[in-house]
Regions:
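A charged, well-structured terminal subsegment
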Residues: 144-148, 152-167
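Conserved non-catalytic scaffold segment of RNase H-like nuclease domains
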Residues: 1-112, 126-130, 134-152
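Short, acidic/small-residue loops that bind anionic groups at enzyme active sites
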Residues: 111-121
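Active-site catalytic microenvironments for nucleophilic, acid-base chemistry
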Residues: 105, 123, 139, 164-171
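Short acidic/histidine-centered micro-motifs embedded in hydrophobic/aromatic stretches
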Residues: 117, 139, 181
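Acidic two-metal-ion nuclease catalytic site recognized across multiple nuclease folds
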Residues: 1-3, 162-200
């Protein structure tokens, strides 16, 4: 895989307040440049949700209402996040969730495409059986020594997802092959289905 052929790509992870639909509490966006996660130009935002953080959500990511009380409201940072994401490709683990939540919070935003490391892992490791982020970290053993934060925080999970993407991408020869394996049907960037040549 020649990483120089990749378009602009941000690995994203979001954490919510636990309601349905969720209010965002944390967003991370980590660029991949030359086959490496670039923490020096990453975007990271904490935001105070409109509704309280549920106890379950706090048990997952560790963020409480007290932690977020002095953080800006989403309306104050949405423009910055929108500008940062731009029209780059994004990647996430179980990307339907992150894409759907971000799209709901960023009207008018549309990435060039969406890579899903969950879908990619199923294509790359069909024998694995389970494809949670923890299971893939255990199986692939990516270098997480420079991962910021802790598991289930957006910055850590984005970094881990980036390292998993890079490791799995090395098994594909071209960007187009990676896209075919990693973009879920119906999401931006999905390859067009081949037309039946007998139809006109």
């Amino acid at each position: 895989m020649n990483f120089a052929t990749w378009p602009a790509l941000l690995v994203v992870d979001v954490e919510g307040n636990g309601t349905n639909p969720p209010d965002l509490v944390e967003v991370a966006a980590l660029p991949i440049r030359d086959g490496r996660p670039d923490k020096s130009t990453a975007g990271w935002w904490l935001t105070c949700p409109n509704r309280p953080v549920t106890p379950f959500a706090t048990r997952v990511h560790g963020l409480t209402d007290t932690d977020l009380a002095d953080k800006p409201a989403w309306t104050e940072i949405a423009g910055k996040v929108h500008t940062f994401l731009g029209d780059a490709w994004i990647c996430a683990h179980n990307a339907h969730t992150d894409y759907r939540v971000l799209a709901a919070h960023l009207p008018g935003w549309e990435p060039a495409g969406v890579l899903d490391t969950l879908r990619l892992a199923k294509a790359t490791f069909p024998e694995l059986g389970k494809y949670s982020l923890d299971k893939l970290i255990e199986h692939v053993r990516p270098d997480l020594s420079e991962a910021p934060g802790a598991r289930h925080r957006a910055t850590f999970d984005a970094y881990a997802t980036a390292q998993l993407l890079i490791a799995m991408a090395s098994r594909y020869d071209t960007w187009d092959q990676l896209v075919a394996a990693a973009v879920p049907p119906g999401l931006p960037g999905a390859p067009e289905p081949e037309k039946d040549p007998t139809l006109w």
